[in-house]
From Swiss-Prot:
Belongs to the bacterial solute-binding protein 2 family. One of its GO terms (cellular component) is outer membrane-bounded periplasmic space. This is Autoinducer 2-binding protein LsrB. Gene3D superfamilies: 3.40.50.2300. It comes from Salmonella choleraesuis (strain SC-B67).
Amino acid sequence: MARHSIKMIALLTAFGLASAAMTVQAAERIAFIPKLVGVGFFTSGGNGAQEAGKALGIDVTYDGPTEPSVSGQVQLVNNFVNQGYDAIIVSAVSPDGLCPALKRAMQRGVKILTWDSDTKPECRSYYINQGTPKQLGSMLVEMAAHQVDKEKAKVAFFYSSPTVTDQNQWVKEAKAKISKEHPGWEIVTTQFGYNDATKSLQTAEGIIKAYPDLDAIIAPDANALPAAAQAAENLKRNNLAIVGFSTPNVMRPYVQRGTVKEFGLWDVVQQGKISVYVANELLKNMPMNVGDSLDIPGIGKVTVSPNSEQGYHYEAKGNGIVLLPERVIFNKDNIDKYDF
């Protein structure tokens, strides 16, 4: 009888140790995927995501393709799902190209969120959104209008690709605003750098050479904007208004030299943090619905908005958009206050 009891105790002890080990292994893991690695904007977002992970006791992995491709992102998504990750947060290179992989992941219980660039809303739970297309499109035009003060002007648009979700939405709104509020502005070309620094510089120089009387380049892309600024310096075009979106650390020398008077962005480190906090809430508690809020340390309250804020026609429970609290216009007076 005593021997039987000892065996039972040993079995229970072993079971307890195994359960404890399983509990340790069951700590949540979140994958944070950019459009591509090696770009300061995305690295900063990844830093914010990993900082939030440390604060929450969550393992956050930052990884992305070396080139912005649907196939590269799909491969990463599938790999993370097969490795047992609990949530995936992705900046999508295509609104629909990732959807089959993301829907399969959701069917396996993986929580899916997007940040920076969205998919179709039915392919994720929440989009951590830097601003609505109307907000960001208006911001682009207003920055250009601060410098182009003549009624008739020639404007070029220059960004990453014709298929990327976010930038095309902003540009669509920007062009609509130009048509309505600046009918004398002629949009002479729309070109793409495909998230490649060398190609972006070549494309920017090509635009400036092809349109010697160009008044402004609007470049809402982290590679395109510094490329446009460098091209203007290389070709000694000092009278060209260059505006768009990029990080302050990348753009600081161009602002200090006066090549770029102002440009915009949002706190992408904050965007990474918010993404992980929302994913953590989704993993630990009930899904948030439109109107629900979450308090994030050091940031404040964020609220779930309907997908219609982004122009979508899809709404569902546990699905929506989380807008960043603010956007920033950087210039020589404030750029040194930021480090990302």
